[in-house]
Amino acid sequence: MTAVAIALLASDFITKQIALTHFSGTDPTSTLGGLLKFTLVFNSGGAFSIGEGETWFFTTVKMLVIVVMLVVSPRIRTPLWAVSFGLVIAGAAGNLIDRLFRDPAPWEGRVVDWIQLPHWPVFNLADCGVVCGSALVMWASMRGIRLDGTRATEEPAEPGTTERTAEAKNQ
């Protein structure tokens, strides 16, 4: 979980700095025949610019999501849940850093978005982490995979181990 989070958070930070340096004050840069564009947008709202101007709300929500996931994360015993939590935590943290430290003021900062696909709002790597990590969480939940790796139909692991009980193994 930690390695995934660090890799995404670092990638998000570096790519935002590149976007600020190379795309500021320029027209969108097209690549792949116009399929992918790089354009700099400062987003004061949530995903897809919903709730524009409610930065304090999104800042608070992101902080709560990170805290809850960090509190729950010690129970994770599978790579699937570790990767999904790492992606969501890093994505939320990447955009939270923008909200806390970018203009116009602390807690009111705008998120740096710079990736644009046709018929889609501009986004960044942190957004990709939140979306992909959330999709993995939903997929694992729908399949009944618990944080400890057991299925909802199995008995959970013994406390302090990753091994299922003998009864669950024999079923």
Predicted regions and their residues:
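Alpha-helical transmembrane bundles and membrane-interface segments of multipass inner-membrane proteins
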Residues: 1-171
